[in-house]
Amino acid sequence: MATMIPGEIITPEGDIELNVGRSTCTINVANTGDRPIQVGSHYHFYEVNAALQFDRDLAKGMRLDIPAGTAVRFEPGDEKNVNLVAYAGSREIYGFNGLVNGPLE
């Protein structure tokens, strides 16, 4: 039997698929501001910095479809497509910029 190392994560062989079966979309985002903006993996994309221009209605209830703990950075003048994934669970959003603070449906 192998010795377990504290904090060690043992994963199965092969690739790990993230967010399987959840609704996704791709949106074009432009940073119209004069400063870089970084958005974390679990931030409610609908509520990100107002200098990011995109279809906010499409982003309601969605977050970046990237691994937990990572982020996407938008430099001033940047325009790029990002993939979003729907929040799961109770689908209640609290905090962030206070634009929802309750159930999404």
Curated annotation (Swiss-Prot):
Which reactions are catalysed by this chain? Answer: urea + 2 H2O + H(+) = hydrogencarbonate + 2 NH4(+)
Cross-referenced Pfam families: Urease_beta (PF00699)
Q: Where in the cell is it found?
A: Cytoplasm
Q: What GO MF annotations does this protein's record show?
A: urease activity
EC number(s) on file? 3.5.1.5
In terms of NCBIfam families, this protein maps to: PRK13203.1, urease_beta
Sorted alphabetically, which PANTHER family does this protein's record hold?
UREASE
Designated name of the protein: Urease subunit beta
* Organism, as annotated: Synechocystis sp. (strain ATCC 27184 / PCC 6803 / Kazusa)
